């Protein structure tokens, strides 16, 4: 199955993983921060074990933006 991860907040996306990386459920994928203060608005975690095969490169995100896609083997 493919899990598409969306942003729940608007701001700047700072990735904490790399493309083509294996992650476990709960792994921190990245953070959404406010551009002026740098306050973390959202921590985005992996919903399942799997392979990150798509990871956002453009840092500006809006609520609902696609952040990553994970290929899960379960």
PLM features: what roles do these ranges have?
Residues 68-74:
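C-terminal regulatory/interaction regions
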Residues 1-31, 35-67:
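Generic structural motif
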